[in-house]
Structures are given as structure tokens and as C-alpha cells.
């Protein structure tokens, strides 16, 4: 208390101009002081040292997962880098890949289409892992990296998503993820369904989409674009949801379920 009393006494002795300066200094210190509660995401993120934008962009972050977008241009190699594991990649824009491990070429000009997914184990920097774009167009990726390394017993049962009016194609299934592909043709709706579990929607082909909850519109004809993401987790277990394609182009997205 004595310290605060001295500060107040000194403040009252200041001239009007000096008081304004004092207040400005306090505001700057408050606004730009480091946030002790901010989360350090570096252990979940990739760094491609050869690229102009080596860190890409964090496009989503919550208590379960971090999503990072990276773009590799034609003829570019990412540069030697590590992977944290518990991670999948989704090709928003696919292309031709070549890869090296321990400085040796592992594969060359392998094609990955738009919407294709894969799993990344942990790779230490000592393995000298590197990948390059062997095609003529940029490759755009979104990495989904889990924060929690839970045991099988802690995960419980997680079910595949089903839609009444649309068939979902299972693209990937392991101990941490399901990944399903959804295609909505013009005028097509998913059908009312429960939204259970922890899921992320990642758009591959965009368009105009509408959404309903319990039969009532949440929004109508919202434009979505490739690479858009949405966290899907219902606040009420009894609510039904559905989305519909109200545009003229086919919409495609992948549904990532965290187990």
C-alpha cells in the first residue's frame, strides 16, 4: 500500500503535460506487455526454412488441435524440417511431390489430388526430412495437429458421421482420426443429423451453402472457399443440424473427426 501511495503522491505533483505523458506511458506498457497466459504453439507447428513464408498461417486453434496452412510453390523444396507427430495433412490444392530422407531421394513426382489426406508420424530434425513440389502449380496444405497425446482408454468410443441424404466416403482411419469426404451437388442437403464428437470441416471445393438447426435456418447462401475451416461441436446433444448446397457448383469438404 505504501508503494501505491507514493506513486499517487508523485502523480499529483506532476504538471498537466507531464501527467499526460505519464498516462501514455502506462497505456503503452499495458497494451504491449507480454501476455503470460498466451499459449506457445511452436511445438505443434511446422517450419519450412526454404520458403518465403516458412511458418505459413495458423488458421484455427483450440484446446484440441492446431490447423496450419502452408503453400509450396512450383519447383520449391520445403527445406529440412521436423514433424511433431499426431498430425494429418489435407491437400486443398494437390500436385506432384518428391521427397528426401537422410539426404537420399525417397520418391519422385508422386501425385496427390485435391482433398487427399495422410498421416505424419513424428520425424526428428536429425532424419533430414524434406519434400518438394515437382509440378507446375502451387500445392496448398492444411495440417491438423493434435495437442493431446491421450491413451486408447481415455479416448472412448467415437463414431463415424452419417448423413441421411448423402453418402460419406471414408478416406482415413487410425487411432487418432477419422477423415470422411462429403460431396454436395447443387440443391442437395445432408439431411437432419446429430452433431456428436469433435469434428472439423475443411472445404476443398467451395460454393453457396446454407445451414439449419432443428429445421430453422442459421444462415442462407453463405459463400465458402477452398481452405475454409469450421469447428463442429454441438452445445446440445438433442439438436439436429444440416447443411445444403444452394449454389450452382458442387461443394466438397472433408470432415475430420478427433477420436
Predicted features, each with a name:
Residues 22-31:
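Bacterial N-terminal signal peptides
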